[in-house]
Swiss-Prot record:
GO terms for cellular component: cytosol. Its EC number is 2.7.2.1. Homodimer. This is Acetate kinase. The active site is at D150. It comes from Yersinia pseudotuberculosis serotype O:1b (strain IP 31758). It is an enzyme of class 2 (transferase).
Length: 400
């Protein structure tokens, strides 16, 4: 089988992750990160042939300068790779209800991404810049750009999962509903879990936990998403690095009316100053929380609230499994590495038959997958996610 090289772009509001991946075997030829956009220290780091390199992009540089650098400097060193590119895959955070699967980028698709900006105000504008710059930089691949949506996997949710108990007209006229996020990751680890369990995906019942700086839990029944913890935006659900997750909506009125905070200040508080950062008042880094759990009250407090919330979501999603749960799967930076989070969470779920195996749990870290429960226990797995591979495979499939 000949190689199918895909350039995968993930444009954030102040960063751009990129990789060239062979969609046939998952081999990564180049990967990198451009960050600190719009700041004096804007820079780019990349790995090629195992060697790491770094360069300044110039003060105030952003997506356009980063893509120029990728094309004219990094790929210029590898003309053979550049010549073999067959497609460009773009990660898109929010596709609204319009996109239920990955699609080739057209004017209509670009308009659909624009229409979803209110639900992803930081990410979707950055994705549109990435698409525009890619079309400019690779005119030969103009019809080979593919959009892969974080929300697409969750479009199989039934109405009872995605509707809020608000006036129905808010959904009909304004699209206010649950959309979820991290769908590409939840889909990937569901596929991988089916392989581990030697089951067809369409017979798989799992609860997948993508835990990183952002986190979400998804109920997967018969291979399809039936519920997920993130909502209209990625603010709902779990305790996250700097996001509050679930709270009583009336807290917002109290902050405004009694404490005189503006809507913008409340938005900043809930999205950038809450979560682990808010609970520790020190850091959003889960490693600090894990390392200091036994000795510092702030770390213990944050960890306990984090795991309590996570266990509640896993427990509630078992009600959606039609009486059969094949496994709970952990992934994402915290899910793959924070053994303490997994242990404290599963310890709360003894009623469901989970019994952690301490040695297995400690072994399944730093990129290693594996079972983390005892042989007599209900199954829990660690599966490192690979969203870039899904994006590359979808791009290759749709442009073949």
């Amino acid at each position: 089988m000949s190689s199918k090289l895909v350039l995968v772009l993930n444009c954030g509001s102040s960063s751009l992750k990129f990789a060239i991946i062979d969609a046939t075997n998952g081999e990564e030829h180049i990967s990198g990160l451009a960050e600190c956009f719009h700041l004096p220290e804007a820079r780019i780091k990349w790995k090629v042939d195992g060697g790491k390199q770094e360069a300044a992009l110039g003060a105030g540089a952003a997506h356009s300068e980063a893509l120029n650098f990728i094309v004219n400097t990094i790929l210029a060193q590898k003309p053979a790779l550049s010549a073999q590119l067959t497609a460009i895959g773009h990660r898109i955070v929010h596709g609204g209800e319009k996109f239920t699967s990955s699609v080739i980028v057209t004017d209509d698709v670009i308009q659909g991404i624009k229409d979803s900006i209110p639900f992803a105000p930081l990410h979707n504008p950055a994705h549109l810049i990435g698409i525009a710059e890619a079309l400019k930089s690779f005119p030969n691949l103009a019809d080979k750009n593919v959009a892969v949506f974080d929300t697409a996997f969750h479009q199989t949710m039934p109405e009872e999962s995605y509707l809020y108990a608000l006036p129905y007209s808010l959904y009909k006229d304004h699209g206010i509903r649950r959309y979820g996020a991290h769908g590409t990751s939840h889909f990937y680890v569901s596929q991988e879990a089916a392989k581990v369990l030697n089951k067809p995906l369409e017979e798989l019942n799992v609860i997948t936990c993508h835990l990183g700086n952002g986190g979400s839990v998804t109920a997967v029944r018969n291979g399809k998403c039936v519920d997920t913890s993130m909502g209209l935006t990625p603010l709902e659900g779990l305790v996250m690095g700097t996001r509050s997750g679930d709270l009583d909506p009336a807290i917002i009125f109290h902050l405004h009316d009694a404490m005189g905070m503006s809507v913008d200040q409340i938005n900043t508080l809930l999205t950038k100053e809450s979560g682990l950062l808010g609970l520790t008042e020190v850091t959003s880094d889960c490693r600090y929380v894990e390392d200091n759990y036994a000795t510092k009250a702030d770390a213990k407090r944050a960890m306990d609230v984090f795991c309590h919330r996570l266990a509640k979501y896993i427990g509630s999603y078992t009600a959606l499994m039609d009486g059969r749960l094949d496994a709970v799967v952990f992934t994402g930076g915290i899910g793959e590495n924070a053994a303490m989070v997994r242990e404290l969470t599963l310890d709360k779920l003894g009623l469901l038959g989970f019994e952690i195996d301490h040695e297995r749990n400690m072994a399944a870290r730093f990129g290693k997958s594996g079972t983390i429960t005892k042989d007599s226990s209900r199954l829990a797995l660690v599966i490192p996610t690979n969203e870039e591979l899904v994006i590359a495979q979808d791009a290759a499939r749709l442009t073949a």
